[in-house]
């Protein structure tokens, strides 16, 4: 293709091409936002992600009890989604694969024990929690993002003997590694593990009308595992074992990005990593912090994923208060804001709503915690590179009436969850139009 495509030599064609792409993107945007009765609920241009995680691991948020009773499971979801709507949230991140399992009908992973009490046991009446949650969220004008934990198989070693017979970890024990506590994980260095995880995510996007596929901050275990046998095959190519481990996680992220968008062009694929990528004292590009960074601790190069454009959004878990010496909230927000600038990758901030309930730190106690969370949200709205927030986790709003009321206050003016186009590198020569990757229909660069 002509490398000068879109330059002044082509007159107004570059502008017309951009308009054409915008029209195409708009055609793809119908699944990004849902309003009751088919009406558009929010004003054009008024976009902000107002998200909340709905955790199912250890039944943190859902279900209220492990049961096969479909009525109980339905009513729990209805109650949760009604409250989320009442608080002004416009997106929910529903954990559907907490531990190598499924809260949906899967041909790959077994039904979750957190749902029915026994891994592999289905709910009554053919009930499918994910399908029901998607329909109910959309009926309330909210996006539904399916949240998976990619590698984790068991949350405690006590669960190891109780895996379902059809669990891929049972059928393929060669793919499993264990950490120092005996918890089981799929080996990130094994290509078959990557294929399994990606196939599982693709199954969700293929079979359900989800708005996004979301992964959280668990990658390599923190320690105590042995992957020497796998590394031996790659040692010549990667003399540095840490670099090899990071390349394995990178491969998962890149493959996931490509596979999901090949199925559904406007799917939103994003990750919620640790709030710290790396400290400046360890990496020149790092933040002015002194906490545990994902780059070295769990081999997750979250900054690199943004720079490479492998994700549609990044949602760092900045779970500290403003002024916290080890990891200042404001410092990290500014650092991540600089990281995403000009990339077309959206930045959402992961907020520690749970600290207003469980923290003993003065900054989070009582009214201080309410004010802290309010300030975070308002400061984010003042930063043009921050496109919203997501709170961990739902049950804390039920435990703390003050932050329930806070959400109603700060979300009193409705906003649409993002899903529109972002034009970056708009120099007419290497334009990239990103609306959750519908620009994949076109080259990333118009150069050959």
Give the positions of each predicted feature.
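Glycine-rich, aromatic-flanked loop segments that form ligand/cofactor-binding clefts
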Residues: 46-51, 89-100, 128-178, 214-216, ...
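Active-site-adjacent "subsite" loops/lids of carbohydrate-active enzymes
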Residues: 47, 53-75, 135, 146, ...
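The substrate-binding groove and active-site-proximal loops of carbohydrate-active enzymes
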Residues: 59-71, 111-127, 180-195, 237-249, ...
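Catalytic domains of carbohydrate-active enzymes, especially glycoside hydrolases
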Residues: 75-102, 207-212, 304, 310-313, ...
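Aromatic-lined substrate-binding rim segments of carbohydrate-active enzymes
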Residues: 94-149, 233-263, 328
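Substrate-binding cleft of secreted/luminal carbohydrate-active enzymes
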Residues: 299-325, 339-426, 438, 442, ...
């Amino acid at each position: 293709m002509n490398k000068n495509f879109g330059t002044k030599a082509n007159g107004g064609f570059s502008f017309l091409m951009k308009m054409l792409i915008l029209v195409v993107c708009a055609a793809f945007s119908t699944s990004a936002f849902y309003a009751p009765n088919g009406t558009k609920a929010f004003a054009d241009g008024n976009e902000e992600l107002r998200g909340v995680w709905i955790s199912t691991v250890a039944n943190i948020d859902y279900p209220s009890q492990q049961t096969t009773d479909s009525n109980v499971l339905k009513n729990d979801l209805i109650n949760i989604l009604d409250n989320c709507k009442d608080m002004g949230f416009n997106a929910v991140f529903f954990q559907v694969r907490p531990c190598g399992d499924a809260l949906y009908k899967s041909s790959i992973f077994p039904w979750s024990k957190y749902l029915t009490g026994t891994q592999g046991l289905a709910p009554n009446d053919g009930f499918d929690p994910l399908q029901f949650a998607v329909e109910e969220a959309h009926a309330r004008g909210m996006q539904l993002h399916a949240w998976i934990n990619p590698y984790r198989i068991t949350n405690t070693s006590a669960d190891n003997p109780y895996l379902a017979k059809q669990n891929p970890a049972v059928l393929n024990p060669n793919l499993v590694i264990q950490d120092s506590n005996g918890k089981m994980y799929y080996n990130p260095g094994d290509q078959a593990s990557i294929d399994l995880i990606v196939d599982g995510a693709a199954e969700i996007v293929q079979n359900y009308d989800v708005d996004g596929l979301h992964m959280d901050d668990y990658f390599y275990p923190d320690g105590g595992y042995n992957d020497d046998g796998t590394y031996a095959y790659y040692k010549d190519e990667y003399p540095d074992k840490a670099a090899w481990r990071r390349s394995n996680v990178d491969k998962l992220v890149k493959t996931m990005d490509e596979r999901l968008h090949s199925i559904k062009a406007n799917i939103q694929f994003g990750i919620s990593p640790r709030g710290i990528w790396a400290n400046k004292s360890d990496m020149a590009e790092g933040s002015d912090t002194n906490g545990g960074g994902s780059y070295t601790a769990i081999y997750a190069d979250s900054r690199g994923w943004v720079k490479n454009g492998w994700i549609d959004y990044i949602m760092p878990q900045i779970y500290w208060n403003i002024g916290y010496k080890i990891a200042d909230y404001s410092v990290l927000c500014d650092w991540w804001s600089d990281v995403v600038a000009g990339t077309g990758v959206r930045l959402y901030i992961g907020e520690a709503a749970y600290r207003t309930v469980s923290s003993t730190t003065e900054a989070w106690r009582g009214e201080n915690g309410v004010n802290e969370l309010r300030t975070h949200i308002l400061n984010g709205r003042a930063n043009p590179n921050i496109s919203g927030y997501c709170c961990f986790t739902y049950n804390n709003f039920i435990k703390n009436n003050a932050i329930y009321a806070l959400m109603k206050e700060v979300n009193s003016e409705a906003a649409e969850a993002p899903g529109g186009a972002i034009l970056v590198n708009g120099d007419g020569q290497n334009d990239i139009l990103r609306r959750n990757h519908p620009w994949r229909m076109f080259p990333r660069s118009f150069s050959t």
